[in-house]
Amino acid sequence: MKRTPKWLAIEEMMRPGRLTRDGMLGNDSRAIEEILEADNKRVASLGVTHADIAQRLRDLTAVAKSRLGDPVVVEETLELRIEEARGSIPCPFKHPGRARKAVVYCTHLPSGQELVWTELGIHMIEAHGFYEGHGSPYRLEPERAVKLLGIKPAEKGDT
């Protein structure tokens, strides 16, 4: 498959030291198009959408923000904490706007498992179906997110 300049430029922006210290691709050797295709299939197989996942992350982020960095337990199963830094970061897909530099740490209390995401990550999931590459510090595995955050497939007829 011949790669287009558009995708090569996006991938370049995701490399370490460009927008973030560690980059967004981790140790994933696949092309960005392959990462997107694989995650699209994974999310579809779960019966949810990128928007469903992003909305749940956005809702939890809002709760964490309201606590100004202090931990908060939500729904008796999730402990949230947010770390915010000055500034903002652009979308590597050249999407308009910028995301605040914020990292949310979410511990699933029954299992002790942790999920970590960023505000930019929420945008990239919703607008681009991008969960970051394997090995990236902020890679969000769709299956884990759906399971640990209790994201349910929409019922037929739900809007």
Enumerate the predicted regions with their spans.
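Alpha-helical interaction/linker modules in multidomain eukaryotic proteins
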Residues: 1-159
